Amino acid sequence: MADGAGAGAAGQASGPSGGSSGAGGPVNPASLPPGDPQLIALIVEQLKSRGLFDSFRRDCLADVDTKPAYQNLRQKVDNFVSTHLDKQEWNPAMNKNQLRNGLRQSVVQSGMLEAGVDRIISQVVDPKLNHIFRPQIERAIHEFLAAQKKEAVPAPPPEPESQDPPAPSQDAS
């Protein structure tokens, strides 16, 4: 039973707003152990808020259509669709939605998308992983955790001697 309760609490904290930990206050990410679901959720939310995932997506999409794996997959899908449609006998009463859904299912069941996407990932994403994405993610995580540590440590109270004495011009009035 305790495992189920723990999973539920972790699930609540993984929401976009960070959720509540049940302990009452906000969770200090720097105090969570590596791999903790709450820490992971907080980091992912931070990366999203910085726009890193959008940046990575744009970077990959800008590069994808130049890669042979994409061009090969596109050609395979085009040929598959042409062959599939050639086998259909056109009828004006034909339900186009059913035809479209049947074609979609055939493409998915063929397995060509899964294999083609895997090849695209290895040509587009994998080369960027260690040299582009990882350093940006690590930098963002370090900055996030450092900022959280600063918030968790209360600032020292101002020194009483640093207060300015009243200006003499006010006393002369």
Swiss-Prot record:
Record's keyword annotation contains Cell cycle: yes
What PANTHER family does UniProt report for this protein, alphabetically? BIORIENTATION OF CHROMOSOMES IN CELL DIVISION 1 LIKE 1
Q: Which gene encodes it?
A: Bod1
Major localization class: cytoplasm
User: Its quaternary structure?
Assistant: Component of the SET1B complex composed of the catalytic subunit SETD1B, WDR5, WDR82, RBBP5, ASH2L/ASH2, CXXC1/CFP1, HCFC1, DPY30 homotrimer and BOD1.
Biological process (GO) annotations held by this record are: cell division
Name assigned to this protein: Biorientation of chromosomes in cell division protein 1
Composition bias, Pro residues: 154-173
Renumbered residue ranges of the record's region Disordered:
1-35, 148-173
What is the role of the protein in this entry? Required for proper chromosome biorientation through the detection or correction of syntelic attachments in mitotic spindles.
Question: Organism's domain of life?
Answer: Eukaryota
Q: Which Pfam families match?
A: COMPASS-Shg1
Disulfide pairings:
none
GO CC terms: centrosome; cytoplasm; kinetochore
Q: Which family does it belong to?
A: Belongs to the BOD1 family.
Positions with biased composition (Gly residues): 16-25
Q: Where in the cell is it found?
A: Cytoplasm, Cytoskeleton, Microtubule organizing center, Centrosome; Chromosome, Centromere, Kinetochore
Sorted keywords for this record are: Cell cycle, Cell division, Centromere, Chromosome, Cytoplasm, Cytoskeleton, Kinetochore, Mitosis
